[in-house]
Design a protein with these regions (language model features):
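Amphipathic alpha-helical packing segments from all-alpha helical-bundle domains
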Residues: 25-32, 102
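Active-site rim elements
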Residues: 12-19, 89-93
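Short, contiguous alpha-helical
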Residues: 4-5, 15, 19-23, 30, ...
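Positively charged, low-complexity intrinsically disordered regions
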Residues: 27, 79-81, 89, 108
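Bulky hydrophobic/aromatic packing residues
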Residues: 11, 26, 63, 84-85, ...
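Acidic/histidine-rich alpha-helical segments that form the ligand environment
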Residues: 86-121, 132-141
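Terminal targeting/low-complexity segments that flank the catalytic cores of oxidoreductases
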Residues: 1-10
Length: 158
């Protein structure tokens, strides 16, 4: 067996690393948000600002739109404004299940991309290549994970 057949290619490693990082961030968000009461999950401790629940809706919508809908052709139709203004939020089990499903969609879509597809332009030109867009989406998730951590401290008054 040649060395190349027993080692991951750079493309495989990049795809794996992106998905693993996103899954770790998702797990961190769940760890922060799951212990909260519904009131804490949906309260807005900073005005103007977002609730933790609304940020989770936003992360879910972002992944479903840019990765699921645009790259995976899932047919997802985004309502970004609703992500931040939902007045009748979903039950917590549904909120977390939808986040899990969005991250699973990313894994499925990314696993199916070839090197040529990763290097191709993303449907939204502002992102550059598909690979660069995927890096952006992971960074975006990380940014909001940090905000969620801060909001948990505020709602828990820690």
């Amino acid at each position: 067996m040649s060395a190349s057949s027993t080692q991951k290619t750079l493309t495989q490693e990049a795809k794996s690393a992106l998905c693993e990082e996103l899954e770790q961030l998702r797990d961190a968000v769940r760890q922060l948000a799951e212990p909260l009461t519904d009131r804490e999950l949906w309260s807005k401790p900073v005005d103007p600002g977002n609730s933790i629940g609304h940020l989770i809706l936003h992360l879910t919508g972002n992944l479903n739109h840019f990765v699921g809908g645009q790259l995976g052709k899932t047919g997802y139709v985004r309502d970004r404004e609703r992500e931040f203004a939902e007045s009748r939020p979903p039950a917590r089990a549904e909120l977390f299940a939808n986040l899990d499903a969005a991250v699973a969609t990313v894994r499925r879509v990314v696993d199916g991309l070839s090197e040529a597809q990763l290097l191709a332009p993303h449907p939204e030109a502002k992102f550059g290549s598909v690979y660069k867009a995927l890096m952006h989406f992971v960074a975006h998730f990380a940014l909001h994970r940090g905000q969620i951590s801060y909001l948990v401290r505020l709602v828990k008054k820690v």
